[in-house]
Amino acid sequence: MEPIFIIGIILGLVILLFLSGSAAKPLKWIGITAVKFVAGALLLVCVNMFGGSLGIHVPINLVTTAISGILGIPGIAALVVIKQFII
């Protein structure tokens, strides 16, 4: 098969996906996840700022941000408990 023919088929399928609206669903999911991760990071910053006087410090990295973003307040509480008693 000619490369032009293959590129044309792929381009046609991409245009069909955009016209049908199904390409927006994964982008929406990625956006929601990104907002949750940012909110989790901000919550961890607040915990580190206000918990600093109590000796509470949770490192901010991808794993802790994901846990606090997805689980919310219970996730942050779990991270603090793990940090204080296990590590």
From Swiss-Prot:
Tree of life domain: Bacteria
Membrane topology of this protein: Multi-pass membrane protein
Positions in the Forespore intermembrane space compartment: 1-2, 58-87
Location within or outside the cell: Forespore outer membrane
Single GO biological process annotation from the record: sporulation resulting in formation of a cellular spore
An example molecular function term from Gene Ontology annotations: metal ion binding
Cytoplasmic side, ranges: 24-36
GO cellular component: membrane
Binding site for Zn(2+): 57
Keyword Repressor: no
Keywords per UniProt: Membrane, Metal-binding, Sporulation, Transmembrane, Transmembrane helix, Zinc
Major location (coarse): membrane
TM segment ranges: 3-23, 37-57
NCBIfam families registered for this protein in UniProt: spore_BofA (TIGR02862)
Function statement: Involved in the mediation of the intercompartmental coupling of pro-sigma K processing to events in the forespore. Inhibits SpoIVFB-processing activity until a signal has been received from the forespore. Could inhibit SpoIVFB metalloprotease activity by coordinating a zinc in the SpoIVFB active site, preventing access of a water molecule and the sequence of pro-sigma K, which are necessary for peptide bond hydrolysis to produce sigma-K.
Subunit details: Forms a complex with SpoIVFA and SpoIVFB localized in the mother cell membrane surrounding the forespore.
Annotated protein name in UniProt: Sigma-K factor-processing regulatory protein BofA
Organism whose genome encodes this protein: Bacillus subtilis (strain 168)
